[in-house]
Amino acid sequence: MIEESRRPSLGDVRIGVLHHARSSLIRSGYMIGPMSDRWRARGAEVIDIIGTGTSVPLDVLLCHVDLSVVPEEYRRFAQNHPRVINLSATDIRKRSYLDDLVGIDDPYSGPVIVKSNLNHGGFPERLLEPRGSGLGRIANGILRRLRRRIGMVDEIRYKSDYVIHQERSSVPPVRFHDGSVIQPFRPERQDGNFVLREYYFLGDIEILNTEVGSDPVLTTGRQVECIQDSPPAEVRAIRDRLRLDYGKIDYGCPDGEVIVYDANKCVGTRSNPGEAVLKLAAVLSQGIDTWIESTPSS
């Protein structure tokens, strides 16, 4: 298992974390929360920057705008800083990096999983939408449940809405045109459970975490391994394509073949992370040294 190594003080270092102007979740539920705690423990000042209205002197800025497509104003704001993490990671929609997606006319006939093209079912985007009235939200929830009960296809709003079909032909045609993506369902299995491999990274710190669980869709399970190591070449290629300095990529290795499932640049956690997550965050946080020691951009 991974262990945090002793690192030098970050005294006098100012680290900024850039969030969307309407973000209601700053650190709770994100890996950046316990990582920031570790930076502070090493003496750094960590500053949350909400929106692009105010600029403060920083040594490093981490772009943490939790949208599948980052608005241009945030990239412009970020590039004015000397060292920027995830400056060029501006589009993580699944169509931008998954090469095995199935189209309506493709001959593929095996099991498929229907996902949202947006990260996490588009939930981060909806968090930034103006909130409707309480009665309106209740009515919309009831309508969604009724539509499902009578078999009508509804939009994918959460990861729990992802659906597995045993044949491509059983996918409702609307799913090929409504912002969904259809990927062959090729999970890695172990003793009847589903295996999820996670590649966490910040700079030159790379962590491979493996979980097993009974749910084929939701990515929470029992941790069976967590080591510092390099990922398979196919996984690193996705990181390079998305130009990610910090993030997480989910994948599996069914029958020895590497299959990428998902990528994220604003890594989430539970609101009260357990010891395993805190240890992972502590080791991952040390990747900030890559930027502290680098030459500032002109």
Regions found by a protein language model. Give the residues of each.
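Conserved N-proximal alpha/beta basic substrate-recognition cap immediately N-terminal to
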Residues: I2-G134
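Phosphate-binding site of ATP-dependent enzymes
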Residues: L143-R239
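Short beta-strand-to-turn element immediately C-terminal to the catalytic PLP-Schiff-base lysine
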Residues: L127-P130, L202, Y261
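Conserved anion/nucleotide-ligand pocket segment
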Residues: V112-I164
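A long amphipathic alpha-helix within ATP-dependent nucleotide-binding catalytic cores
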Residues: Q183-F185, L208-V260, N264, G268-P296
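Generic beta-strand structural signal
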Residues: V13, P107-V112, D178-S180, R197, F201-L202, C253, ...
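Short catalytic/ligand-binding loop motif for oxyanion handling, primarily in non-cytosolic enzymes
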Residues: V69-E72, K94-R95, H120-P124, D191-N193, ...
